[in-house]
Swiss-Prot record:
One of its GO terms (cellular component) is basal cortex. It holds the Pfam family HEAT. GO terms for biological process: astral microtubule organization; establishment of mitotic spindle localization; mitotic spindle assembly; positive regulation of microtubule depolymerization; spindle elongation. It comes from the Eukaryota. Microtubule plus-end tracking protein that promotes the stabilization of dynamic microtubules. This is Protein CLASP-1. The gene is cls-1. Residues 269-311, 579-711, 764-792 are annotated as: Disordered.
Length: 1333
């Protein structure tokens, strides 16, 4: 056990929450892919550690612990289920956690635990009923969670938990008097559900407790009646007598202990019927050999003496020719296959019942009530129950007209629960007889017994997944009868919930039922749910199971035949591979579509070695691909394929007119794909007259081989060969033909699919190549004039460029962005194109591709500049993406591009519109911004208020109305952010600045807005304004003496009017912080130094003064202030004397990084070092090793936990600006000689980030030097070092490819290589998913 992976990881568990989070992520990744060893000590140690995590005070550790327990339960349920029950009290306690996420995860884990093998909801409820826990816990949240679990069990497993629920009625009634309102509501809901499911007997039981007063009882009855009324035709289904409830429970408990349970966990994605699957599955029995004789009588009509052996004989499958018997036995039964029970067998068994005599209504009532009581009793002999099922059919068959039909139907509807219980039985004879009886009821009464159908359908679908063929096939056949005869919304909802089942047999049966539903249901019933039907068909086509996909393609063929528009929509949403498979599947399975395709296939022989696009386009008119195809089609002789079998005799094949022939070809070959204007359709343009059209049509279609041609037959053949068309008269057929011609005209227009498919053909022609520029210079219509060509070319070029922008290839995406920026210069783009372009640019901006971000930002600037009048609806989304990007760490050139793009937005759009959109985005709860992104948003609003570019006449003017609902909401949101202890310190300066700017812009509206805020917000705002005014009063005299002051921090520019100038400066010159208001004496604030950029004398004196202050380590405050002033100069661009002060300043920075004082802000020194490296990188070449060593020393010796983050940023700047060979040499020496894990982690992270930033050619040069370092680091004993090594190797594989690193990765074992492959696959899948979106 000492070498077990889980044991090794558990030994690293500590009390530090940060270490627990790191270790938890490693355990979660491993335990999601590996099974837990069944060693008792290991499992107990694992659960002890997790219990400690769950009972800790850090909720993040609790969440990761619950995720680990959930993943372990999914991978190793047979090992951990019993151990979890021993520690169930910990989960129950977590149900009362203060965090909603922790409570929900604990409740879901308890639900999952109840539906595992050797477990049941009964066992979990027993634990919740223990005194002091669950329903009697002192924490009200635990009570609410326990009540919610009980409600779920009542809904999903009523038959199992009804005895316990009845015993809990007094406790539930007492909880309705709980002091907490949520507990009272939850207990009331449980009682209402229990009344609905249990019926009048449960209502009487609740009333007999006499715990509830009359008012509460009346309220419960009222809610019960309203619930029944809202369910329409769904009366309570589970009215089980109380006096017999203990017998089924004991029996069910005995069954659950006798064999492993097969109950499926009812999660949010599973359905109600899967959760109520059968409790256990009997072992497989070797079936005798099946006799191939068709004269074998059906076992349904034989006596029950040897029914078991005959059932097993019937349950064997006859393997088709060419298929191995073992393989065929592994597939599940479907009603359409050769299963143990088929539709014909059911219909034959309908009348195979004993003869009885029915004399009166009371006789019918007596017999059916007897059958109901026998079927409900699980301890009754199975043969008696089977006879009672036959008796039900016999009663119906032998009832004459004197029997009251309403009485008969009411008695049959009362059998719903008994029949459902029989369908779930463990004996195949009972399941078969119950399925036959239910099918007989649906066949005989139809919609009158829909309640029975809705009750037994979940049970039947659950039985489809069992391994016993006779039971699975009986249930599958029953579902076919239900779907055929019962057409209600509840039936479809049950089927829709089955789409998320994990059982491939159930999903396969659903696909088969979809075909039946589409073909048999009435149009009025299907119309409201047609979109959901299409979704199910699409899910079946894309299913992981091959047989399910085949059934899904058959359902698609039926859907295309009856609802073409829905089928076209499905086809357009599928990828090309699925489309090709769908075409092949439909053409081979749909008889309604074979006629046109058979004709097309017989007209032209198949060309060898065609690619996918050519095979797809072979169904289309050749003139849609090439202008020369018309001549080729005329010159080519007519051929037919004599070897292809025909669906009907040759003399029955009717001729088709040219118009309908082309229409049907387009309609059946593409399924919603391109319908282009072709000369063969008669819409070529002015270059083709009617005679040419007729010639083309006759040349592109095979001559008719029929000798019997009548006008009515000719018209009918144009429309198809169905019975409906054959019944039309000449006038009706002609009218229908005209309507179809008009529809064909609309469908023959070019669309996106034409552009996509034809562009692919032009890219890779079979014999000759064309330059890429022809893609934009050629038109796609064959007979259109020049103007049409240019118009279509412009539209389709934009669409093609946008599709290329979503490519996963970086080079193709880069070329598409360049083409798009050129296309955007055309100001004639319509609104739809602008909308598509805006959506594409938003997705590109959100991808986070560092290599293309500058090109994307430049393209967005051009787009905004040229088409801003059409982009009001896109402004909110674009600003949100821009704020998110500005909040991320990026290189200086990227920040400059972001600033330029932001300025383009500010100077182009109307300021009032910008303010409204930004405020709406700020208050939208859907958008969750990072702290730095929130800071960028607040600064953007400040820029709108402060008139950064007063030369723009559209800027916000003074006295602009700001008292609007969206401004009020934004101010409240700002205070919510500011008072957040996690991010308030970051946002405080921007909030102060925003308050001052708002007051300066419109003081009256400022007073109205802040008058409705809480007192603490008003006091803070007024204090900021007062303090700001006091600070500025001392500076007004200096401002008046100077002729002009330019605020160069891109935050202020004074307006020409002198009075306004003083008003603005008095408010905007500088801002304090909230902490400054608590200091009695005002502090000195840093003054802008932009005016020193050109005055070298004053600049040198200022820098010398600050550097003298930096040398006084005895006064850390002065050192920090001096560093802040110098850093501010560098940010403002006023530090220009690099040659004079660079070496001296670098020496001071090194000394600060080396000092052991914790009062000096070393992170600020690192930022200064970054600025120096960015501005004068060549001066640091000689001291590269010293700079890296100082940063590493500072990060490793500091007590600040955030110092490592600043060190990572500094090392990344150094690595990307200093000589690459020196960086690699220093890194190798540190990794090989230094044993400090923290230094190794920082170096590995620096190299990993460098891999992502440098060019591929440079990376290829250093791969052989750095790859061995990462491979050796992968063997480190420190998990953090190994993690960084894995990430570095993954980054290398992504950039240079696996073959380039193959020689270095040979040293790793298979497990480590698999982990690298796993992370590389995840990175590629996430990248492709982002690009596709």
């Amino acid at each position: 056990m000492d070498t077990n992976w889980l044991y090794v990881l558990l030994q690293k568990s500590t009390a530090d929450p940060l270490e627990r989070l790191k270790l938890g992520n490693v355990i979660l990744n491993e335990i999601s892919q590996r099974k837990v060893s069944p060693h008792p000590k290991l499992v107990n140690d694992f659960l002890d550690v997790m219990s400690g995590w769950l009972t800790g005070s850090n909720f993040k550790v609790t969440i990761i612990g619950l995720e680990i327990l959930d993943a372990a339960l999914r991978t190793s349920p047979e090992v951990l289920a019993s151990y979890y029950f021993d520690r169930l009290s910990v989960l129950i306690e977590r149900m009362g956690d203060a965090k909603v996420q922790v409570r929900e995860m604990a409740i879901n884990l308890c639900r999952q635990l109840a539906y595992l093998e050797n477990s049941s909801p009964v066992m979990l409820l027993d634990r919740l009923c223990v005194h002091g826990t669950g329903f009697e816990h002192k924490q009200w949240l635990v009570k609410v969670g326990s009540l919610n679990i009980l409600r779920d069990f009542l809904s999903d497993s009523f038959a199992l938990v009804i005895p316990q629920a009845i015993n809990l009625i007094p406790q539930l009634c007492r909880l309705t008097n709980d002091p907490n309102s949520e507990v009272r509501d939850a207990s009331t809901n449980c009682l209402v559900d229990l009344m609905v499911f249990g019926g009048k007997s449960i209502i009487a039981k609740i009333a007999n407790t006499r715990i509830l007063n009359e008012q509460k009882m009346a309220t419960l009855l009222q809610r019960y009646e309203s619930t029944i009324a809202t369910r329409g035709d769904l009366p309570p289904k589970h009215s089980i007598p109380i006096e017999t409830s203990s017998i089924p429970r004991n029996n069910l408990l005995r069954r659950s202990l006798r064999s492993p349970a097969k109950i499926i966990h009812p999660s949010a994605s599973t359905t109600s019927f899967t959760s109520s699957a059968r409790l256990s599955t009997p072992p497989r029995t070797n079936a005798p050999s099946l006799s191939p004789s068709p004269s074998t009588p059906s076992p349904l009509s034989l006596p029950a003496a040897n029914g078991r052996s005959r059932d097993l004989a019937r349950s064997s499958l006859r393997a088709p020719a060419g298929m191995s018997l073992s393989r065929y036995r592994s597939s599940s039964c479907a009603p359409a296959a050769q299963c143990a029970i088929t539709l014909d067998d059911f219909k034959k068994a309908f009348n195979a019942v004993p003869k009885i005599s029915i004399y009166s209504n009371s006789d019918v009532r007596e017999k059916l009530e007897t059958a109901n009581s026998v079927l409900r009793n699980a301890n009754e002999d199975w043969s008696k129950r089977a006879n009672q099922l036959k008796l039900i059919r016999s009663v119906i068959l032998n009832s004459d007209d004197s029997i009251d039909q309403r009485l008969l139907l009411s008695l049959i509807n009362e059998l719903a629960d008994a029949l459902e219980f029989s369908i779930r039985d463990l004996r195949s004879q009972i399941v078969r007889e119950a399925a036959i009886t239910c099918s007989f009821l649906f066949e005989h009464f139809g919609m009158d017994v829909r309640n029975v159908a809705e009750c037994v359908l979940p049970a039947a679908l659950a039985q489809v997944a069992v391994s016993t063929k006779i039971m699975a096939s009986s249930a599958a056949t029953l579902t076919v009868f239900i779907v055929q005869k019962i057409q209600t919304r509840q039936i479809f909802q049950t089927l829709f919930d089955l789409s998320t089942s994990k059982s491939k047999e159930q999903r396969r049966q659903l696909a088969n039922l979809l075909e039946t539903l589409i073909s048999s249901w009435d149009l009025k019933v299907k119309q409201p749910i047609l979109k959901s039907i299409s979704q199910l068909v699409q899910n079946a086509i894309c299913d992981a199971d091959g047989e399910t996909r085949v059934a899904g393609r058959k359902a698609f063929a039926k859907l295309e035949q009856l609802h073409g528009a829905a089928a076209d929509q499905i086809f357009r949403e599928l990828d090309p591979a699925k489309q090709k498979m769908l075409r092949d599947g439909v053409s081979s399975s749909s008889s309604s579509l074979n006629s046109d395709r058979d004709n097309n296939n017989q007209k032209q022989p198949q060309q060898p070695q065609q690619n996918i696009s050519q095979k797809f386009l072979s169904q289309r008119s050749a003139s849609a691909l090439d202008n020369k195809s018309q001549v080729l089609s005329i010159a080519k002789p007519q051929q037919s394929n004599p070897s292809r079998p025909t669906a009907m005799p040759v003399n029955n094949r009717l001729p088709k007119s040219s118009t309908s022939s082309s229409f049907s070809a387009v309609r059946s070959s593409g399924y919603g794909q391109s319908r282009a204007k072709t000369p063969s359709d008669g819409f070529g343009g002015t270059n083709f007259n009617n005679n040419n059209n007729n010639n083309n049509k006759s040349s592109s279609s095979s001559p008719s081989t029929s000798t019997h041609q009548t006008p009515i037959q000719r018209v009918a053949s144009n429309l198809g060969s169905s019975s409906f068309v054959a019944s039309l008269t000449q006038e009706q057929a002609s009218s229908l033909q005209n309507a179809m011609d008009l529809a064909k005209d609309e469908m023959s227009k070019n669309n996106e699919d034409d552009e996509f498919l034809l562009a692919e053909v032009r890219k890779t022609p079979p014999k000759e190549t064309s330059p890429p520029a022809s893609l934009y210079a050629r038109g796609y219509g064959n007979g259109s004039n020049g103007s049409n060509n240019s118009s279509n070319n412009s539209i389709q070029s934009v669409e093609h460029i946008l599709k290329a922008c979503t490519s996963s290839s970086i080079n193709e995406k880069r070329d598409a962005i360049i083409s798009l920026s050129q296309k955007l210069l055309d100001r004639n783009l319509d609104s739809l194109e602008c909308k598509n372009i805006g959506d594409t640019l938003s997705r590109l901006l959100a991808e986070g591709n560092t290599t293309l971000i500058i090109s994307i930002l430049e393209t967005i600037s051009i787009f905004v500049k040229c088409h801003y009048k059409k982009l009001d609806g896109w402004l909110k989304l674009a600003l949100g993406k821009l704020f998110a990007k500005m909040g991320a760490d990026s290189l200086p050139n990227v920040k400059s591009a972001l600033s330029s793009t932001q300025k383009m937005f500010l100077t182009t759009f109307d300021p009032s519109t910008q303010l409204k959109e930004v405020c709406d985005f700020m208050c939208d709860p859907v958008h969750l911004l990072a702290p730095k992104s929130r800071l960028a948003l607040l600064e953007y609003i400040c820029l709108l208020f402060e008139e950064i570019w007063p030369e723009d006449p559209r800027c916000l003017e003074r006295q602009t109305q700001l008292d609007t609902p969206y401004t009020r909401a934004a101010v409240r949101k700002m205070f919510a952010w500011m008072f957040d202890p996690r991010i308030g310190a970051i946002l405080m300066p921007a909030c102060e600045r925003l308050v001052c700017a708002l007051f300066a812009l419109n003081a009256a509206d400022f007073t109205m807005i802040f008058g409705d805020l809480p007192p603490e917000c008003r006091d803070w705002a007024y204090r900021i304004l007062q303090l700001n005014g006091q600070q500025q009063s001392a500076q007004r005299q200096q401002i008046m003496e100077k002729e002009a002051i330019t605020m160069t921090n891109n935050n202020y520019k004074p307006c020409p009017p002198e009075v306004e100038k003083f008003e603005k400066v008095s408010v905007k010159a500088s801002f304090s912080t909230y902490e400054a208001t608590r200091v009695p004496e005002p502090q000195d604030y840093r003054k802008p130094t932009v005016h020193l950029a050109k005055n070298h004398v004053e600049q040198a004196a200022y820098i010398r003064n600050q550097m003298d202050l930096m040398r006084d380590f005895q006064k850390p405050d002065r050192v920090n202030e001096a560093m802040a002033n110098l850093h501010g100069m560098m940010c403002e661009g006023s530090f220009t004397l690099w040659n004079q002060f660079f070496d001296e300043l670098l020496d001071e920075i090194y000394q600060i990084l080396s000092t052991l004082s914790q009062s000096i802000r070393k992170k600020l020194a690192m930022r200064i070092l970054q600025k120096m490296c960015t501005a004068q990188a060549t001066k640091l070449f000689d001291s590269t090793e010293i700079a890296i060593s100082k940063v590493l020393q500072c990060a490793c010796t500091s007590e600040d936990n955030t110092m490592s983050v600043a060190a990572e940023d500094c090392l990344r700047i150094l690595a990307t600006h200093l000589p690459l060979p020196r960086i690699v040499q220093i890194s190798r020496r540190i990794l090989s000689q230094d044993d400090d894990d923290q230094r190794g982690v920082l170096i590995l992270k620096m190299l990993t980030r460098m891999f992502q930033d440098i060019d591929v050619d440079e990376l290829h040069m250093i791969v052989d030097d750095v790859a061995p370092c990462f491979v050796s680091a992968y063997d480190s004993t420190s998990s953090s070092v190994r993690k960084c090594a894995v990430f570095g190797l993954v980054a290398l594989v992504q950039r240079v490819g696996m073959p380039r690193l193959e020689t270095h990765l040979r040293k790793l074992n298979a497990t480590k290589l698999n982990l690298i492959d796993l992370y590389v696959g995840r990175a590629k899948s996430s990248e492709s998913g982002t690009s596709s979106n």
